[in-house]
Amino acid sequence: MNLETQFDKVLYRHDEVRAQLSSGEGMDSQTIQRLSKELSELDPVVTAVQAFRKAREDMVQAAEMMNDPDMKDLAEEEFYALKERLPALEREVQIMLLPKDEADEKNAIIEVRAGTGGEEAALFAAELFRMYERYAGLHGWRFEVMDVNDTGIGGVKEASATITGRNVFARLKFESGVHRVQRVPATESQGRIHTSAATVAIMPEAEEVDIQLNDSDLRFDVYRSQGSGGQSVNTTDSAVRVTHIPTGLAVACQQEKSQHKNKATALKLLRARLYERERSAKDAERAAARKSQVGSGDRSERIRTYNFPQGRVTDHRINMTLYKIDAVMSGDALDELVEALVAADQAERLAEME
């Protein structure tokens, strides 16, 4: 389908939805809500299409006016200005017309795990977790810790949280993968640089309508919460492990003192993992991408390197380096990487459509 046909389809659908909402005949509140949402999504696309077509028409008129000696200079100036602007307007519309990822508007669940590198990897995992917490705060998103398995000396073996806000998953989904750190640990007396790794997994938060869990498919185990070093930190069996029998996926949670709250959190995390598994199964390309990004936490598989002695952060997927590691770790400069990754993804998908 060529671009002009796509434009016409969008304009036709926009008029159709607007007419349906205006009449409102025989529509229940759910239908009205669905159509209103569709109209709000179509509005900016229609505006962009109209701006592109208007600029193109103005350019044709300017070209015709260049034949008039009295208008030649002014017409030439307008013609070349529009000619320069037109590709950007066209690209803007093309990006808007790219197929949407159904999960982009969802909230996200983040899991950070220490990989290779022992205690240094656990310390780095904790720093990454805090980086995303600060980044969420800068965007006005809500960051709610689900579970933390800490080492007792500042590191985390594993930590998870729910991030709630507008287009959270769309912004964060490219953070999934192995993050490598190179620096001199505080305990290193010889000043040698060590390499460690942590994995980040970003999953869309799944609702019950996305993944339905049958009680018969679940096994619940309760036990006492364990603190750092393995000592019990609770006198009741408040920690919960839930296993999805058909897939073997298991999730444990011990963050809260309430067994009921830990169970709810574990189910939420399990549902997200199952939803992500289902999404990957439906899309072979996405499954391959996730496998190469998330990996096993081994230092040989990496999407990004944080080199503290050089003060740089390098994203290997797009060959982008920022010499502002402190600003990235504080969340302030993370948007520069996120924006570049989103743009690279859009460029790839546009190239596939051509």
Curated annotation (Swiss-Prot):
> N5-methylglutamine is carried by which residues?
Q231
- What post-translational changes are documented for it? Methylated by PrmC. Methylation increases the termination efficiency of RF1.
Q: Which UniProt keywords apply?
A: Cytoplasm, Methylation, Protein biosynthesis
* Pfam families for the chain: PCRF (PF03462), RF-1 (PF00472)
Give the subcellular location: Cytoplasm
GO CC term, one of those recorded: cytoplasm
**From what superkingdom does this record's organism come?**
Bacteria
| Described purpose of this protein according to its UniProt entry | Peptide chain release factor 1 directs the termination of translation in response to the peptide chain termination codons UAG and UAA.
Family membership, please give it: Belongs to the prokaryotic/mitochondrial release factor family.
* Record-given protein name: Peptide chain release factor 1
Q: Which organism is it from?
A: Paramagnetospirillum magneticum (strain ATCC 700264 / AMB-1)
